[in-house]
Amino acid sequence: MDFSISTIALFTLLVSYLLGSLPSGYLAGKWILGIDLREIGSGSTGATNVLRHVGKTPALFVFFIDVTKGIGAILIAKSFLLDESLQIAAGLASLSGHIWPVWLKGKGGKAVATGLGVFLGISWQVGLGSLGIFLLILSIWRIVSLASISAAISLPVLMLINSKETFSIPYIVISFIAMILVLWRHRSNLIRLIKGQEPRIGKSN
């Protein structure tokens, strides 16, 4: 049976969204402590809220799963030999699923770990570069949101540097969109950072 490129593209976008929607953090909270992370702390189902309210080991598993969701979306698109525009569409579908999961009535995470996965899938150099910036900022200030915001802001710069020889407009575009999404999801954190009220690792929200 032959499938048109549009059918394959729609299938890829749907699978990428559903993959991104996998509520790993929510499930960790429910299965381990019987809590709903959407009602605790930052209200996010991401790894940071899991770390603060469930524990280090569950947070590491959630982080790994969320990164894998982003990588998976890009690899699925690449496996179908879809072009760069459709690859970034798959990445954005995965990010959208993570932020607005259908299973949790649209209340999910902040797109940091899944975003890392997307960029590791697109360009491992950019993905590792942003991860390095995240870890550097985190080691100095011990504030996860500041590290996440810094890593997000670095994405367009890293992508531009990495694209000197093979410039890709779609990849540049997704780096800006991902940055905006992460900043928007961290808008309350930004306010607390400005006020000097953002908690460091080891303290609750």
Swiss-Prot record:
Cellular-component GO terms for this entry: plasma membrane
Entry keywords, A to Z: Cell inner membrane, Cell membrane, Lipid biosynthesis, Lipid metabolism, Membrane, Phospholipid biosynthesis, Phospholipid metabolism, Transferase, Transmembrane, Transmembrane helix
Gene Ontology molecular function, alphabetical: acyl-phosphate glycerol-3-phosphate acyltransferase activity
Annotated EC: 2.3.1.275
Membrane topology: Multi-pass membrane protein
GO biological process: phospholipid biosynthetic process
Pathway(s) of this molecule: Lipid metabolism; phospholipid metabolism
Keyword flag Endoplasmic reticulum: no
Localization of this protein: Cell inner membrane
The UniProt record lists the keyword Transcription: no
Enzyme class: transferase
Record field: catalytic activity: an acyl phosphate + sn-glycerol 3-phosphate = a 1-acyl-sn-glycero-3-phosphate + phosphate
Record-linked Pfam families: G3P_acyltransf
Transmembrane residue ranges: 8-28, 57-77, 84-104, 118-138, 143-163, 164-184
InterPro entries registered for this protein in UniProt: G3P_acylTferase_PlsY
Function: Catalyzes the transfer of an acyl group from acyl-phosphate (acyl-PO(4)) to glycerol-3-phosphate (G3P) to form lysophosphatidic acid (LPA). This enzyme utilizes acyl-phosphate as fatty acyl donor, but not acyl-CoA or acyl-ACP.
Family (UniProt): Belongs to the PlsY family.
Name of the protein in question: Glycerol-3-phosphate acyltransferase
Gene (UniProt): plsY
